[in-house]
Amino acid sequence: MANFTKQAIKASFIKLLNQKPLSKISVRDIVEDCGINRNSFYYHFQDIPSLLGEIVTEQTDELIRQYPTISSMEECFSVAFHTARENRRAVMHIFNSANRDMFLQDTMRLCEYVVDTYLTTVFSDASISGDDRRVVVQFMKCQLFGVWIDWVSSGMKEESLSDLQRMLQLCRGVPELIVAHSNNRQL
């Protein structure tokens, strides 16, 4: 029963977040939407930011579980952009709220996972030093995160995605060059 209530609270919050800004959602709105009392809400969550944090972390973890391997840069970007597009209004409401730091931290964690998984999948047999791998992950993670943030801060426009596809075409082969440069340095 407790897990059902907790899931109902999360579902109501996400529904409301897709309807109005985070700052306009109250505990009262959530409990009225899912038909519980305030005490039930506070039994499960300290406040709305803790509810938001748990939802964002769970959704990030779920995305990570869904992609045990990633075989192209296009797939890297697709993972980062797919869920945001599905929940565009909610993402914009979180991004434009005072609680966006936790959202950005989990987005950065997702970007790091995606890049690390891509490198492991595509370059599993390439010999790249631990230091170089760390630097490459840092570089590519920040690149992915930066493009994602730019897209969200510009309103998540659909037409921006075609520019992103073109950027990926222009950058095709860059990860391979980075690994090749790492191997040349080691010689």
Regions found by a protein language model. Give the residues of each.
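Alpha-helical bundle regulatory/interaction domains
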Residues: M1-K20, K24-V27, D33-L187
